[in-house]
Amino acid sequence: MGPRAKAVCSLFILLQVLAEPAENSDFYLPGDYLLGGLFTLHANVKGTVHLSFLQVPQCKKYEMKVLGYNLMQAMRFAVEEINNRSDLLPGVLLGYEIVDVCYISNNVQPVLYFLAREDYSLPIQEDYSHYVPRVLAVIGPDNSESTTTVAHFLSLFLLPQITYSAISDDLRDKQHFPALLRTVAGADHQIEAMVQLLLHFNWNWIIVLVSSDDYGRYNSQLLNDRLATGDICIAFQETLPMPQPDQVVTEWERQRLEAIVGKLQQSSARVVVLFSPDLILHNFFREVLRQNFTGAVWIASESWAIDPVLHNLTELRQTGTFLGVTTQSVPIPGFSEFRIRRTPVRLPEPNRTSLEATCNQECDTCQDTTASFNSILMLSGERVVYNVYSAVYAVAHALHSLLGCTQACSKEVVYPWQLLKEIWKVNFTLLGHNVFFGQQGDVLMPMEVIQWQWDLSQNPFQSIASYYPKLRQLKAIHNISWHTANNTIPVSMCSKDCHPGQRKKPVGIHSCCFECIDCLPGTFLNRTADEFDCQPCPSYEWSHRNDTSCFKRRLAFLEWHEPSTIFVVMLTILGFLSTLAIMVIFWRHLHTPVVRSAGGPMCFLMLVPLLLAYAMVPMYIGQPTFFSCLWRQTFFTLCFTICISCITVRSFQIVCIFKMARRLPRAYGYWVRCHGPYVFVASFMVLKVVIVAGNVLATTANPTARPDPDDPNIMVLSCNYRRALLFNTSLDLLLSVAGFSFAYMGKELPTNYNEAKFITLCMTFYFTSSVSLCTFMSVYDGVLVTILDLLITVLNLLGISFGYFGPKCYMVLFYPERNTQVYFSSMIQGYTMGKD
């Protein structure tokens, strides 16, 4: 005997103790093909699953479930409506057998009854492909626990089961539940709708309360998984105690409820997400009212979102705003009248025996109870009711296709597995909604977020938003009446959201609890990338405090219209014109003693580069380019080196004539014969060219932008030769020191040859200004560096023009009597006689 046969054998033993249902028009309707219905008409708070007991529980002893009776009537209405149609199953009558499952207490007995034959036997066979059970399909039950139990039995026979409100995602496993389908979206969609609702109102600090059964644990785990990577934090999560079947509050339960509600009072969170069956919540909400806990937003799961009994506890309006996630309301024409219509009890049929009322097919108080709740049931709309209605129609359409109905149907034997294959294929429109089963066996009907209202003129469960499972999107949130002062949206945040440009500094273990810290200048906050760290701006950009982005810095360089530039340009023009005038004067008096003592033709070797240096001053003004930086780094410094080297060699030559010619006559002779001054200048020029070429190769001539330390909004655009500046001017500095030394040595020479004061002044100014500029540039990067660089350069040029050539021109122009050979000879003779 195989495992499957053994399982059926065990069921057969239990089946023998079960009785046939009592006759009742609400629970039984004969027909050519029967459907089974499992509904919760009565419910114990926590029923016991009687798998190990022979006695079947009597559901009528438990509390009446109004919604369960409402759903049962939907199945009856759908069957009778189909039987009255001529286009669907013509000539075929559907019947039903409906059983009260008492929530989870009475699951096994009904499914065994449905699987049995008309003679109440369930044979043990190896092949059930040609087995015909009492019913062709089962509608229900309503919760995931019961559905799982029933599905394990029905799947052995591939008997179709369509549940209308069991949302557990485990039921999508077709390897374990091949015969199970649903006309309701899964639990993941309920969670997604809740999360999107929380995000819409910026509620990132919530409390989660769950029941201690599988429903509470499963849904809370789904919520925790969904929030693991989100922006919503759970302040705390508590498990509600399971009440006693008689609803008497025990001391332990009372203390537990007091502690939970007290914790709610102390928490800063004001949004409570509650996953629990409705019967567990009565004692909890009584404790909430007793402690006068108010100002909360209650978010209900589908299990109690539209429960009329809880809604009838009108004092709950004082505790806050009630929102819930449930299925979409689809009005069913004629159903409201059918639901409250009392049907006379039919007498038992001759072929049916009235047995003991242990089969849970009676509800003495259903009619009276539903009549009292009829206004709420009518106004709440046919929500879950449509799920039952569409499930019956899905079976009818599948049977219509299987029987090959056109004008009439062939009433042949139908096996459950044949019907199951056809149910998977159905695709029809019912009351404006397309009904078909997806790959996971679900009909993705839209869901709604509802708000509880207690105003008699309004719908008690008013729709405020719609959720579309196919899009996984919550839309059209509107018409919410907040139970707060001035109808303001409640706030439930551990920390208020930071202002733009402020980063979050976490406080504690929750990412929703934080301090807001301003982003410093030069940094910005990119919330989409990282809310907890300010990002530095790129070097060419800047930001102010609390900026969310960086802006490009303004490029600063010497511009022609600036006062400092105009001043330097005027000095340059003065120097250029003065140098040009000096050239003219020296050219006209080239053979005079004054010009010859200044260097003669070598003066023009100084004046021409000096003019070129003045002419290249505009290279310092305007936006730097590669070529302007290259000219400044090469040709300008070469011109200046020529001038310095000429002054130095001239100072050395004068000292040689008066102090070394007599002591070293042969050396002096070589100096004169080999054109020592020109060789000296040429040698230093070659060395300078090597230095400049090395700098050009080692560094780039491209201009670079550096932040201005005085104004971070500015980027100073300048030539990139700062690192090479000291090395580039080292030769010039060495020449200036040598020139200064030789000039100092010649301070006792004849007056007309004594240039110590002027050369010393020029060389001292150049040395100190160059060293100071290099030092300043190494510690400061502002726009002032460029201005000082140009100003010092022009002043050095002016120092040579006026400091070295100025006195000569003054002598030539204003003291012509001293510019004679006789005067110079007398001065030399006087110096010689004085030395002797």
UniProtKB/Swiss-Prot annotation:
Give GO MF terms, alphabetically: 1-pyrroline-5-carboxylate dehydrogenase activity; G protein-coupled receptor activity
Please give the residues the UniProt entry marks as glycosylated. N84, N292, N312, N351, N427, N479, N486, N526, N546
One GO cellular component this record assigns the protein to is:
plasma membrane
Q: Secretion signal: which residues?
A: 1-19
Q: How does it sit in the membrane?
A: Multi-pass membrane protein
The portions of this protein that span the membrane are 566-586, 602-622, 635-655, 681-701, 725-745, 758-778, 782-802
Q: Name one Pfam family in it.
A: 7tm_3
Q: Superkingdom of this entry's organism?
A: Eukaryota
Give residue spans on the Extracellular membrane side. 20-565, 623-634, 702-724, 779-781
Please name the SUPFAM superfamilies in this protein's record: Periplasmic binding protein-like I, TNF receptor-like
What's an example Gene Ontology biological process for this entry? sensory perception of taste
**Keywords in alphabetical order:** Cell membrane, G-protein coupled receptor, Glycoprotein, Membrane, Receptor, Sensory transduction, Signal, Taste, Transducer, Transmembrane, Transmembrane helix
Cytoplasmic-side positions:
587-601, 656-680, 746-757, 803-836
Subcellular locations according to the entry = Cell membrane
PANTHER family in alphabetical order: CALCIUM-SENSING RECEPTOR-RELATED, TASTE RECEPTOR TYPE 1 MEMBER 2
**Which family does the record claim for this protein?**
Belongs to the G-protein coupled receptor 3 family. TAS1R subfamily.
Q: What is the documented function of this protein?
A: Putative taste receptor. TAS1R2/TAS1R3 recognizes diverse natural and synthetic sweeteners.
Query: What does the record note on quaternary structure?
Result: Forms heterodimers with TAS1R3.
Spell out the protein name for this chain.
Taste receptor type 1 member 2
The species this protein was found in: Canis lupus familiaris
| Taxonomic classification | Eukaryota, Metazoa, Chordata, Craniata, Vertebrata
